[in-house]
């Protein structure tokens, strides 16, 4: 019955993705909608009373945990490869500074003053979740609405800077708790240097070792973030390109149809949504839904004003909404925190719901088309509102 549930879940995600595309939604939005609303209803009305299966039962098989580790490592590796592939741009840095700092500070304040007492690293994680954005989803959305290439590059580089800061801060904060959990991944991250000393230069070998060791690190609960960031930085220093384990098209299909649905389902079935909403309280729930979005929009607005207009006719309001998009990065981060028991199930659900709202905001604001006047270069030093 457990295997039947997981097959059914994958089929439901495939159907949701297909239906969403008919309405112009990118896959991650359809998947978030199903995970946030459909799966909890399915668990409450059918799986738990009818099949007599709890969330703990559904995630207990060893084969499923191995498949989860593999899927998580593939997604984390892909995200980190996007983060590390950075060509620093001064305008992107101007946007990223307030876009990260303001929601991060707001998240820390929320964790300390509005949420129940928790370890400092959990409060840090809440601050980072307020600030994080979504590189793949942002890029796909910008491409979907035919946003100007130069403006797209600037926004994506801003997202990369923010995500790199979030992942790196959390990785070292986590490693500081247990020195052994920091040293072992750092030693593994130096493998590219050893391979170069052995005169081995094939990018496929470096990349294969990266994904294999990332799976091992995730499976044995080592600090996969420290390993992943360090390994890719070594590869970048050696000018060795990362080669994905599968062709790009196949990798995209694997993520869309298996890895992302598996990770979303693995997280959401562990949550009793009714109890989660009751335990949070109205003020806490409202804060977790509204403050991340509001503080992120404020940071984006200030950063875009500091950096200046990206093209004639660009709107600070529209670009602020675009940089508020969450998605895959947030999902992976949330699951990482939930599996390590650094956040509660109710906090997981509230922030996933917030991420869905933030990701839908550009579409709800009517951003299906870009401004007509996009060809002329910018003359003003400030973006239009």
Regions found by a protein language model. Name each.
Residues 25-34, 89-102, 149-160, 200-209, ...:
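Cytoplasmic-side transmembrane-helix entry/capping segments in multi-pass membrane proteins
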Residues 11-25, 74-89, 136-147, 190-201, ...:
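C-terminal ends of transmembrane helices
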Residues 40-91, 208-286:
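Membrane-interface junctions of multi-pass transporters
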Residues 7-10, 14-21, 161-245, 253-256:
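Core mid-bundle transmembrane helix pairs that form the ion/substrate translocation pathway
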Residues 147-171, 245-247, 314-319, 342-352:
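Membrane-interface alpha-helices at helix entry/exit sites of multi-pass transporters
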Residues 43-45, 86-147, 277-373:
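Transmembrane alpha-helices that form the ion-translocation and gating core
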